[in-house]
Amino acid sequence: MSTNPKPAYRRVLLKLSGEALQGSEGFGIDPAVLDRMAQEIKELVELGVQVGLVIGGGNLFRGAGLAKAGMNRVVGDHMGMLATVMNGLAMRDALHRAYVNARLMSAISLQGICDSYVWAEAISQLRAGKVVIFSAGTGNPFFTTDSAACLRGIEIEADVVLKATKVDGVFTDDPVKNPDAVLCHELSYDEVLEKELKVMDLAAFTLARDHDLPIRVFNMNKPGALRRVIMGEPEGTLIHHVSK
């Protein structure tokens, strides 16, 4: 256990991509990855941190390709929303198997499968120490799950949005294509926009900026990274308002 008993954050919104759940698989959900993530989230709960969770659906369905082939975008986005519900069901089950209380809420009504999203109920569940998984995005087409993460983060008054990725944070360039790309440890919202750094889509990012919601980008595949972020240790990239 860490010698520092106090986490840096009281309530967080953790955003996981659907691709993160597929691990080395090309599609679907890798059970080992799912269970590891559930254990890491359990650590946060044991530290007394309130955790809201948004998971993408890209491991199960991507509407963009089908939209190019002629599918109606609204239909494709509705299918994507259902993919996030499937991931949410898998994560809720993994958390329950790890003896973590979790509730799955959906922005669209799916009676008998999960609860409908109600703001006051979500707050109540978080205060009770339960992990609340927000699924089905915002419930509207044309909005990404990053937008959903920022929206729910603002609604639940999270201290930060933790965006889990496959890289160590935000780089000056694509680290896969450019080996000279440098990791940025701290950025202002304006710097991200001016330098056109890839953090999340513009609608999601400006929503966070306009409501002064900090974003920390980190590598979820790095063992212990999530805990280090929560304990306030230098990990990944912090994006926030930087006073001049």
UniProtKB/Swiss-Prot annotation:
Major location (coarse): cytoplasm
Top EC class, one word: transferase
Cellular compartment(s): Cytoplasm
Control of this protein's activity: Allosterically activated by GTP. Inhibited by UTP.
GO CC field: cytosol
S-S pairs: none
Reactions listed under catalytic activity: UMP + ATP = UDP + ADP
Residues reported in the UniProt entry to bind ATP: 15-18, 58, 62, 165, 171, 174
CDD domains with a match to the protein in the record: AAK_UMPK-PyrH-Ec
GO biological processes: 'de novo' CTP biosynthetic process; UDP biosynthetic process
Region (Involved in allosteric activation by GTP): 23-28
Taxonomic superkingdom: Bacteria
Keywords: Allosteric enzyme, ATP-binding, Cytoplasm, Kinase, Nucleotide-binding, Pyrimidine biosynthesis, Transferase
Binding, UMP: 57, 77, 138-145
Pathways per UniProt: Pyrimidine metabolism; CTP biosynthesis via de novo pathway; UDP from UMP (UMPK route): step 1/1
Known EC number: 2.7.4.22
Molecular functions per Gene Ontology: ATP binding; UMP kinase activity
Family label: Belongs to the UMP kinase family.
Biological function: Catalyzes the reversible phosphorylation of UMP to UDP.
Subunit structure: Homohexamer.
Name assigned to this protein: Uridylate kinase
Species of provenance: Aeromonas hydrophila subsp. hydrophila (strain ATCC 7966 / DSM 30187 / BCRC 13018 / CCUG 14551 / JCM 1027 / KCTC 2358 / NCIMB 9240 / NCTC 8049)
Lineage, uppermost ranks: Bacteria, Pseudomonadati, Pseudomonadota, Gammaproteobacteria, Aeromonadales
Gene label: pyrH
